[in-house]
Amino acid sequence: MAISRLIINHFRNLTAIDLEFERGFNFIIGNNGSGKTSLLEAIFYLGHGRSFKSAVANRIISYQQPHFILHGKIQEQQHQWSVGLQKQRQGNTLMKINGEDAKKISDLAHLLPMQLITPEGLTLLNGGPSYRRAYLDWGLFHHNASFYNAWSSLNRLLKQRNSALQQVCSYEKLKIWDRELTKLAYQVSYWREAYAEALRSEIEKTCQLFLPELEISVSFHQGWDKNMDYADLLQQNFERDRALGYTFSGPQKADFRFKANGLPVEDILSRGQLKLLMCALRLAQGEHLMQQKKRHCIFLLDDFASELDQYKRTLLAERLQKNGSQVFVTAITREQLQQIQPEKHRTFYLENGRIKDL
């Protein structure tokens, strides 16, 4: 999977840009504030229907413009797609795939599997469980065709149950939700645990490359006591849930935890080590997708040199070259990218939202 062409109109300070990309490495160089991260953000938005920096569309649309437009050409082996997305200030989103209206963001996301590595991405390790659930759910979305519908139904039922908790006074009135909720909770949890286990060896192998001085272990927690029947737990905790106004236990509390030498990674690793572990997790997941589904991820790396010494940069660059994916890398200077010497690459220079091909 690769983006061969990208047109951007009125996305932050990127007013009118039309770029053709290399299937391998694409280097984006420029000073702070030049628009490097905005270019990665636009690529990410095209594949997710949202930003990794801001949830407010008005902050992304260029000043005094009614909307932004993204249009991309995507190639995978013998297939080609044309995708477009327009976001209006009023909040409306228009999407097209090969000229036809796309109804769901998931249609775009399926076409463009992406791995994002940014300085803020350490939340995967030191943030709340929701970041690690998203990590597992991303993988399941691309591996299991049935997962998205089950996951969506589960979230819808949880919202309905939480709303009902604030209105009912007896558990009997919740049973209609809990029968289906229990079934979906077990299904989603089973898939998550199986996927986490399938990833384990790939994660351990990649961590050994980047952090050989540490023994990294992973563990999945489904969100409630494995010795408890979930239906019984929902009934047993009804009064507590009603007092809280939401469902306390369940797959919405699941976590995928990481330890280094037996201790939580967020407690003992330096920022540089955390970044290496985050890179290892993203690479392991992308390579697992390639092995299982023969699909390449697109890797987006913002501020390549941040937190990494020269040797670790070289390791990361070599691993990215080896997996054969399309890669977008930002840096302030060319010297920060000297560890990456791919055969196929393009270099772009950004200044005040304007770009040129070097």
From Swiss-Prot:
One cellular component (GO) term of this entry: cytoplasm
BP terms from Gene Ontology: DNA replication; DNA synthesis involved in DNA repair; double-strand break repair; SOS response
Transmembrane segments: none
Molecular function via GO: ATP binding; single-stranded DNA binding
Localization: Cytoplasm
Short name of any one Pfam family annotated for the protein: SMC_N
Function: The RecF protein is involved in DNA metabolism; it is required for DNA replication and normal SOS inducibility. RecF binds preferentially to single-stranded, linear DNA. It also seems to bind ATP.
Protein name per UniProt: DNA replication and repair protein RecF
Organism annotation: Histophilus somni (strain 2336)
Gene this chain is encoded by: recF
